[in-house]
Structure formats: C-alpha cells, structure tokens
C-alpha cells in the first residue's frame, strides 16, 4: 500500500511512522510529507531511507492512504486534494471533527460507522480518546448521565517547542531569555489553560471534550463538565473522571469490564502502590485505568483515574487503527 504521512517530521508524525512499523501495517511505498524546509531530508522507516517530499508531489503519486498531523489549516487545504485522487485521509487535527459530513472515530467505540464514501475521517482530541475508551462499556451497561473530568496534560501535546521551553526552564533559564509557547513558565507550574478561552469561560480544549463525546457516543444528553490543565510532564495525559449513572453498578463488575475492554489495561491495586502514571504509560498504546472507587455523594457515582500516552493512543495509534479498520472493511488494499 502507498502511504503518505503528512507532518512526518513532527512529534505525532514520527509516532505515526513508529506505530505503522510496530503494527506491521502493509506499507509498500512511503511518502513522508513535511514543510518546504524539510523537503529532501531523509528519514528511516522499516530499515530503509525515504525522502521527504512536498504535498504536491505526494498527491501526484496518488497514495492509497494519508495520515495527517500537520495542523488544522494544512488539513483544511490539503485533505480534500488527497481525497480527490482517491486517497483515504485520517486527519489528526481538529478541523474536520465537528463537520456533520465527516466521521469522528475511536475504532473500539464506533469504528463500524465508517462507510465506503468516507474519504476524510477525523481523529478525535487526545483527551477525548483516552476518556471515551473506558467510558464506552460503562455507558452501554449503566447509561452515563454526567461526566466531570479534570485533565493533567503533558507538554508533548503542544509539540517540540513546548518541550524545549520546559527544558530551558529546568536548565535555569529566566523568563524572557528563551522562546516560550506558553504565557507563563511551565516547569514547577501548572496552567489551567489549554487552547484559547471562550466567552463562556471554558477553553476550546474543554469544549472539544464536550462536543466530541456527544458526537462519538451519538448522545447529546450526556452532561460533560471538563477542566483541562497543562502540567510539566512528558509521558502522557492523566485524567480524574467522575461519573453519575442512570443505573446501579458494582465495583467488581466495573473492574471486570476494564479488564475485558480492548485497549484498556487495569492498574488498580493502591494498597501496593499500583495505579496509572504517565511515566510508565510513555511509549505504550493502551489506556491505563485505576483508583476505581464509588462517589459517596450521589447514588450511582463512580470515580477513576486514567492515563495514556497522548502521542500514541491519543493520536498516532488511534489514526493507524482507523486505517486498519478501513482495511478490515475492504476500503483499503491489504498490501
């Protein structure tokens, strides 16, 4: 299969290449696409060197699949051009997510919604993906009335420049002496501010979690109240999740569901200091769930903690899994 990776030299793009290789995705020809300054560079994939090409050259090569992680404006401009030549596009930006004509997919949750005429498919927000994967079996069993979620999001979600800012601060750099992508220092700090603020007081990141939950679950009645926070870690995103159900549940059944849910790993033995942590989620594809306990303030309430590598399941892995679903449905060649 001829595969283009748009944004191949970025944080998520490099993870996409890693995941394609690790999962033995049937790539016979790779078209790494990046900005003009990177065209001509060599990258290594599956032991072979490939040359970074322009988007125009990649489109002319008529790939079967294009994985996009190059920002919303790039996706808005280029995704339709790839689709016009018969290429299936999986886009990691926010541009297409709430477009009513485009599918927003977490394969383990709603992969079956993909149809033959879906040439541009949206990858959800990283924090939404890791929340909804464990929520889906719980919603099917007990019907979620309300979700209250607070996120603790890695600087890797912002990209290389955010990592550089944190590194400079940890080396003793003073504010104003280094390039900063955040409005305040991030090292030894926490910023309750991801993306821009809206008139409601919520941020765009928070509203992504609300709107994407409704679209993926196909249920606008679920109450979602998020607070998204940037923290000075690199391993992945963490979330404190509080749920209120329509139906009663047992903790034993909840734990069993988490053990049996594909893509979820249960780490819930706090007496022995076993619980999910971003340091140990780094580089892994699963969503890790623990600290499962009742919320005593409501009749059918549940609290838990979940962690995932935002560059993996929160982005690259989910995108490749969507492509695998396209193969499974016969919409992409098997080789």
Locate the predicted segments by residue.
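Charged docking surfaces used in two-component/phosphorelay signaling
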Residues: 66, 155-335
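N-terminal Rossmann-like NAD(P) cofactor-binding subdomain of oxidoreductases
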Residues: 1-186, 221-223, 287-288, 292-297, ...
């Amino acid at each position: 299969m001829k595969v283009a990776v748009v944004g191949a030299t970025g944080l998520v793009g490099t993870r996409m290449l890693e995941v394609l290789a690790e999962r033995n995705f049937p790539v016979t020809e790779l078209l790494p696409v990046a900005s003009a300054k990177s065209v001509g560079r060599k990258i290594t994939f599956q032991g072979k060197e490939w040359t970074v090409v322009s988007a125009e050259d990649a489109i002319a090569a008529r790939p079967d699949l294009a994985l996009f992680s190059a920002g919303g404006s790039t996706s808005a401009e280029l995704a339709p051009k790839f689709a016009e030549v018969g290429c299936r596009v999986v886009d990691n930006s926010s541009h297409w997510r709430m477009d009513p004509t485009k599918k927003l997919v977490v394969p383990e949750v709603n992969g079956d919604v993909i149809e033959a005429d879906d040439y541009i498919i949206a990858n959800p927000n990283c924090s939404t993906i890791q929340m909804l994967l464990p929520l889906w079996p719980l919603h099917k069993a007990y019907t979620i009335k309300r979700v209250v979620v607070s996120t603790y999001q890695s600087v890797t979600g912002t990209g290389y420049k955010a990592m550089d800012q944190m590194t400079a601060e940890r080396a003793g750099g003073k504010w104003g002496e280094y390039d900063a992508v955040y409005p305040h220092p991030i090292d030894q700090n926490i910023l309750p501010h991801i993306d821009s603020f809206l008139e409601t007081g919520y941020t765009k990141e928070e509203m992504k979690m609300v709107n994407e939950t409704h679209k993926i679950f196909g249920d606008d009645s679920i109450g979602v109240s998020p607070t998204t926070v940037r923290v000075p870690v690199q391993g992945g995103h963490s979330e404190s999740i509080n749920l209120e159900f329509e139906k009663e549940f047992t903790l034993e059944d909840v734990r069993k569901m988490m053990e049996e849910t594909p893509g979820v790993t249960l780490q819930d033995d706090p007496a022995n200091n076993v619980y999910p942590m971003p340091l140990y989620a780094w580089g892994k594809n699963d969503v890790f769930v623990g600290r499962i306990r009742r919320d005593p303030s409501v009749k059918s309430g549940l609290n838990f903690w979940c962690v995932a590598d935002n560059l993996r399941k929160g982005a690259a892995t989910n995108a490749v899994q969507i492509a695998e679903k396209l193969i499974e449905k016969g919409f992409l060649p098997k080789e």
